[in-house]
A protein has these predicted regions:
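N-terminal amphipathic/basic-hydrophobic helices that include classical n-h-c signal peptides
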Residues: 1-23
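Short, aromatic/basic amphipathic alpha-helical patches
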Residues: 88-99, 256
Protein backbone atom coordinates (compact mmCIF):
# COMPACT_ATOMS: atom_id res chain seq x y z
CA UNK A 1 0.00 0.00 0.00
CA UNK A 2 2.88 2.35 0.78
CA UNK A 3 6.51 2.23 -0.44
CA UNK A 4 8.65 0.79 2.32
CA UNK A 5 10.76 3.42 4.09
CA UNK A 6 13.14 2.50 6.93
CA UNK A 7 12.90 4.24 10.32
CA UNK A 8 14.93 7.38 10.94
CA UNK A 9 18.03 6.72 13.08
CA UNK A 10 20.89 8.72 14.53
CA UNK A 11 24.55 8.05 13.82
CA UNK A 12 24.63 5.24 16.37
CA UNK A 13 21.70 3.43 14.75
CA UNK A 14 19.16 4.45 17.42
CA UNK A 15 15.62 5.29 16.33
CA UNK A 16 15.07 9.02 16.62
CA UNK A 17 12.15 11.42 16.39
CA UNK A 18 11.38 12.02 12.72
CA UNK A 19 11.71 15.71 11.94
CA UNK A 20 9.38 15.47 8.94
CA UNK A 21 6.48 14.26 11.15
CA UNK A 22 7.07 15.96 14.52
CA UNK A 23 3.66 15.01 15.97
CA UNK A 24 4.55 11.30 15.94
CA UNK A 25 5.86 10.37 19.39
CA UNK A 26 8.13 7.35 18.97
CA UNK A 27 8.62 5.14 22.05
CA UNK A 28 11.11 2.27 21.94
CA UNK A 29 9.75 -0.66 23.96
CA UNK A 30 12.23 -1.62 26.67
CA UNK A 31 9.60 -2.52 29.28
CA UNK A 32 6.32 -4.37 28.64
CA UNK A 33 4.73 -2.45 31.53
CA UNK A 34 5.04 0.91 29.74
CA UNK A 35 1.87 3.04 30.03
CA UNK A 36 -0.31 2.54 26.98
CA UNK A 37 0.79 -0.99 26.15
CA UNK A 38 -2.19 -2.54 27.94
CA UNK A 39 -4.23 -1.97 24.77
CA UNK A 40 -2.12 -4.62 23.03
CA UNK A 41 -1.58 -7.14 25.82
CA UNK A 42 -2.91 -10.70 25.44
CA UNK A 43 -4.68 -10.19 22.14
CA UNK A 44 -5.26 -13.94 21.93
CA UNK A 45 -7.50 -13.89 25.01
CA UNK A 46 -10.85 -13.70 23.20
CA UNK A 47 -13.04 -13.20 26.27
CA UNK A 48 -10.82 -10.44 27.61
CA UNK A 49 -10.78 -8.59 24.29
CA UNK A 50 -14.56 -8.75 23.95
CA UNK A 51 -14.98 -7.27 27.39
CA UNK A 52 -12.16 -4.75 27.35
CA UNK A 53 -12.15 -3.19 23.88
CA UNK A 54 -15.78 -1.98 23.72
CA UNK A 55 -15.69 -0.90 27.38
CA UNK A 56 -12.57 1.17 26.73
CA UNK A 57 -14.02 2.78 23.64
CA UNK A 58 -11.33 1.17 21.49
CA UNK A 59 -10.87 -1.32 18.71
CA UNK A 60 -7.71 -2.84 17.23
CA UNK A 61 -6.81 -2.31 13.57
CA UNK A 62 -4.27 -4.78 12.17
CA UNK A 63 -1.96 -4.10 9.18
CA UNK A 64 -1.10 -0.87 7.41
CA UNK A 65 -3.93 -1.37 4.91
CA UNK A 66 -6.60 -1.64 7.61
CA UNK A 67 -5.08 1.23 9.61
CA UNK A 68 -5.13 3.37 6.47
CA UNK A 69 -8.83 2.61 5.96
CA UNK A 70 -9.57 3.46 9.58
CA UNK A 71 -7.80 6.80 9.25
CA UNK A 72 -9.56 7.50 5.94
CA UNK A 73 -12.88 6.90 7.71
CA UNK A 74 -11.92 9.59 10.23
CA UNK A 75 -11.29 7.24 13.14
CA UNK A 76 -8.81 8.69 15.61
CA UNK A 77 -5.76 6.63 16.61
CA UNK A 78 -4.77 6.41 20.27
CA UNK A 79 -1.47 4.65 19.60
CA UNK A 80 0.28 2.32 17.18
CA UNK A 81 2.41 -0.77 17.78
CA UNK A 82 4.88 -1.47 14.99
CA UNK A 83 7.91 -3.57 14.17
CA UNK A 84 11.06 -1.54 13.64
CA UNK A 85 11.37 -2.22 9.93
CA UNK A 86 7.88 -0.78 9.27
CA UNK A 87 8.26 2.40 11.31
CA UNK A 88 9.05 4.59 8.30
CA UNK A 89 5.84 3.55 6.56
CA UNK A 90 3.80 4.18 9.69
CA UNK A 91 5.24 7.66 10.21
CA UNK A 92 4.12 8.76 6.75
CA UNK A 93 0.71 7.14 7.23
CA UNK A 94 0.16 9.09 10.47
CA UNK A 95 1.21 12.45 9.04
CA UNK A 96 -1.30 15.09 10.15
CA UNK A 97 -2.55 13.19 13.20
CA UNK A 98 -1.53 15.03 16.36
CA UNK A 99 0.01 13.45 19.45
CA UNK A 100 0.01 9.82 18.35
CA UNK A 101 2.33 7.51 20.27
CA UNK A 102 4.07 4.88 18.14
CA UNK A 103 5.47 1.98 20.17
CA UNK A 104 8.37 0.31 18.36
CA UNK A 105 9.92 -3.08 19.04
CA UNK A 106 11.41 -6.14 17.42
CA UNK A 107 9.32 -9.16 16.43
CA UNK A 108 10.12 -11.13 19.59
CA UNK A 109 9.15 -8.26 21.89
CA UNK A 110 5.86 -7.65 20.12
CA UNK A 111 4.99 -11.36 20.16
CA UNK A 112 5.72 -11.48 23.89
CA UNK A 113 3.35 -8.55 24.40
CA UNK A 114 0.47 -9.54 22.12
CA UNK A 115 0.68 -13.32 22.37
CA UNK A 116 1.06 -13.99 18.65
CA UNK A 117 3.38 -13.35 15.71
CA UNK A 118 2.67 -9.88 14.36
CA UNK A 119 3.30 -10.92 10.77
CA UNK A 120 1.36 -7.96 9.36
CA UNK A 121 3.81 -5.54 10.94
CA UNK A 122 1.54 -3.13 12.80
CA UNK A 123 -1.45 -2.75 15.12
CA UNK A 124 -3.28 0.43 16.05
CA UNK A 125 -5.53 1.11 19.04
CA UNK A 126 -8.29 3.23 17.50
CA UNK A 127 -10.99 5.23 19.26
CA UNK A 128 -14.42 3.81 18.46
CA UNK A 129 -16.76 6.18 16.62
CA UNK A 130 -20.20 6.70 18.11
CA UNK A 131 -22.90 4.54 16.56
CA UNK A 132 -25.24 6.49 14.32
CA UNK A 133 -29.04 6.31 14.59
CA UNK A 134 -30.64 3.67 12.39
CA UNK A 135 -32.58 6.33 10.47
CA UNK A 136 -29.34 8.06 9.49
CA UNK A 137 -27.66 4.86 8.33
CA UNK A 138 -30.53 3.71 6.10
CA UNK A 139 -31.37 7.13 4.67
CA UNK A 140 -31.08 6.89 0.90
CA UNK A 141 -30.24 3.17 1.01
CA UNK A 142 -31.85 0.70 -1.40
CA UNK A 143 -30.21 -2.55 -0.28
CA UNK A 144 -29.35 -3.27 3.34
CA UNK A 145 -28.31 -6.41 5.21
CA UNK A 146 -29.59 -7.24 8.69
CA UNK A 147 -27.55 -9.63 10.85
CA UNK A 148 -29.44 -11.34 13.64
CA UNK A 149 -27.37 -12.83 16.48
CA UNK A 150 -24.42 -13.92 14.31
CA UNK A 151 -21.78 -14.46 16.98
CA UNK A 152 -18.87 -15.71 14.86
CA UNK A 153 -16.51 -12.80 14.17
CA UNK A 154 -15.15 -14.44 11.03
CA UNK A 155 -18.62 -14.68 9.51
CA UNK A 156 -19.41 -11.08 10.42
CA UNK A 157 -16.21 -9.88 8.75
CA UNK A 158 -16.81 -11.98 5.64
CA UNK A 159 -20.37 -10.67 5.29
CA UNK A 160 -19.14 -7.08 5.49
CA UNK A 161 -16.62 -7.87 2.76
CA UNK A 162 -19.41 -9.27 0.57
CA UNK A 163 -21.57 -6.22 1.25
CA UNK A 164 -18.75 -3.88 0.25
CA UNK A 165 -17.66 -5.89 -2.77
CA UNK A 166 -21.08 -6.65 -4.24
CA UNK A 167 -22.59 -3.30 -3.44
CA UNK A 168 -25.21 -3.22 -0.67
CA UNK A 169 -25.58 0.13 1.08
CA UNK A 170 -25.52 -0.61 4.82
CA UNK A 171 -25.55 -3.27 7.53
CA UNK A 172 -27.76 -3.35 10.62
CA UNK A 173 -26.91 -5.75 13.43
CA UNK A 174 -29.01 -7.12 16.27
CA UNK A 175 -28.23 -6.32 19.92
CA UNK A 176 -26.57 -9.74 20.39
CA UNK A 177 -24.64 -9.87 17.14
CA UNK A 178 -20.83 -10.09 17.29
CA UNK A 179 -18.90 -6.84 17.26
CA UNK A 180 -17.88 -5.83 13.70
CA UNK A 181 -14.94 -3.91 15.18
CA UNK A 182 -13.47 -6.94 16.94
CA UNK A 183 -9.96 -7.52 15.58
CA UNK A 184 -10.80 -10.73 13.68
CA UNK A 185 -13.91 -9.20 12.12
CA UNK A 186 -11.94 -6.19 10.92
CA UNK A 187 -9.15 -8.38 9.54
CA UNK A 188 -11.42 -10.83 7.70
CA UNK A 189 -13.40 -7.95 6.22
CA UNK A 190 -10.15 -6.48 4.85
CA UNK A 191 -11.09 -3.27 6.65
CA UNK A 192 -14.45 -2.89 4.92
CA UNK A 193 -16.24 -2.73 8.29
CA UNK A 194 -14.62 0.71 8.45
CA UNK A 195 -16.19 1.74 5.13
CA UNK A 196 -19.68 0.21 5.09
CA UNK A 197 -22.23 2.23 7.10
CA UNK A 198 -23.55 0.15 10.00
CA UNK A 199 -25.21 0.41 13.37
CA UNK A 200 -27.14 -1.68 15.89
CA UNK A 201 -30.87 -2.29 15.65
CA UNK A 202 -33.28 -2.43 18.57
CA UNK A 203 -35.28 -5.62 19.15
CA UNK A 204 -37.60 -6.76 16.36
CA UNK A 205 -40.68 -5.27 18.03
CA UNK A 206 -39.15 -1.86 17.25
CA UNK A 207 -36.94 -2.74 14.30
CA UNK A 208 -39.61 -4.15 11.98
CA UNK A 209 -41.92 -1.10 12.17
CA UNK A 210 -38.89 1.15 11.69
CA UNK A 211 -37.79 -0.67 8.52
CA UNK A 212 -41.32 -0.86 7.14
CA UNK A 213 -41.88 2.83 7.81
CA UNK A 214 -38.74 3.56 5.77
CA UNK A 215 -40.23 1.60 2.87
CA UNK A 216 -38.15 -1.58 3.11
CA UNK A 217 -39.40 -5.01 2.13
CA UNK A 218 -37.98 -7.43 4.71
CA UNK A 219 -36.74 -10.69 3.18
CA UNK A 220 -35.49 -13.39 5.55
CA UNK A 221 -33.01 -15.93 4.20
CA UNK A 222 -34.03 -19.19 5.86
CA UNK A 223 -35.11 -22.80 5.45
CA UNK A 224 -38.90 -22.86 5.51
CA UNK A 225 -41.76 -24.74 3.87
CA UNK A 226 -43.27 -21.38 2.95
CA UNK A 227 -40.08 -19.99 1.39
CA UNK A 228 -39.73 -18.94 -2.22
CA UNK A 229 -36.49 -19.73 -4.03
CA UNK A 230 -33.86 -17.07 -4.48
CA UNK A 231 -34.34 -17.16 -8.26
CA UNK A 232 -38.10 -16.68 -7.88
CA UNK A 233 -37.59 -13.73 -5.57
CA UNK A 234 -34.94 -12.23 -7.87
CA UNK A 235 -37.42 -12.14 -10.74
CA UNK A 236 -39.19 -9.20 -9.11
CA UNK A 237 -36.97 -7.65 -6.44
CA UNK A 238 -38.55 -4.87 -4.33
CA UNK A 239 -37.02 -1.44 -4.87
CA UNK A 240 -35.98 -1.22 -1.21
CA UNK A 241 -34.83 -4.48 0.32
CA UNK A 242 -33.66 -5.50 3.80
CA UNK A 243 -32.08 -8.96 3.62
CA UNK A 244 -32.06 -10.70 7.02
CA UNK A 245 -29.41 -13.32 7.86
CA UNK A 246 -29.25 -15.47 10.99
CA UNK A 247 -26.77 -17.63 12.85
CA UNK A 248 -25.83 -21.00 11.38
CA UNK A 249 -26.71 -22.92 14.52
CA UNK A 250 -30.14 -21.62 15.43
CA UNK A 251 -31.10 -19.79 12.26
CA UNK A 252 -33.46 -16.85 12.42
CA UNK A 253 -35.67 -16.29 15.43
CA UNK A 254 -39.44 -16.57 15.31
CA UNK A 255 -39.59 -12.79 15.73
CA UNK A 256 -37.42 -12.26 12.65
CA UNK A 257 -39.46 -14.70 10.57
CA UNK A 258 -42.69 -13.06 11.73
CA UNK A 259 -41.33 -9.64 10.77
CA UNK A 260 -40.39 -10.83 7.27
CA UNK A 261 -42.56 -9.98 4.28
CA UNK A 262 -40.97 -12.86 2.36
CA UNK A 263 -38.92 -15.90 3.38
CA UNK A 264 -36.31 -16.80 0.76
CA UNK A 265 -34.24 -19.96 0.42
CA UNK A 266 -31.25 -20.98 -1.69
CA UNK A 267 -31.99 -24.41 -3.25
CA UNK A 268 -29.23 -26.95 -2.54
CA UNK A 269 -28.16 -30.33 -3.94
CA UNK A 270 -26.48 -33.59 -2.88
CA UNK A 271 -28.04 -33.67 0.56
CA UNK A 272 -26.59 -30.31 1.63
CA UNK A 273 -29.28 -28.25 3.31
CA UNK A 274 -27.58 -24.84 3.45
CA UNK A 275 -24.44 -22.77 2.93
CA UNK A 276 -22.27 -21.06 5.49
CA UNK A 277 -24.01 -17.76 6.31
CA UNK A 278 -21.19 -15.67 4.84
CA UNK A 279 -21.28 -17.67 1.60
CA UNK A 280 -25.07 -17.45 1.52
CA UNK A 281 -24.89 -13.68 1.92
CA UNK A 282 -22.60 -13.37 -1.09
CA UNK A 283 -24.80 -15.61 -3.26
CA UNK A 284 -27.97 -13.74 -2.29
CA UNK A 285 -26.47 -10.27 -2.65
CA UNK A 286 -25.07 -11.04 -6.08
CA UNK A 287 -28.33 -12.57 -7.27
CA UNK A 288 -30.40 -9.65 -5.95
CA UNK A 289 -28.03 -6.84 -6.98
Amino acid sequence: LFPHRPPATDGAGRIRQNEEYPTVNIVRIDDLDLPGLDDYARLTDVVLRRLREPAGGLYIAESSKVIARALAAGHRPRSVLVQEQWLGDMESLLAGWDDVTVFVGDAATLESLTGYNLHRGALAAMHRPELRPVADVIQGARRIVVLEDITDHTNVGAIFRAVAGIGADAVLISPRCADPLYRRSVRVSMGTVLQVPWTRLPEWSEAAPLLHAAGFHIAALALSENAVTLDEFAADVPSKLALVLGSEGDGLSRQALSAADTVVTIPMSHGVDSLNVASASAVALYTLR
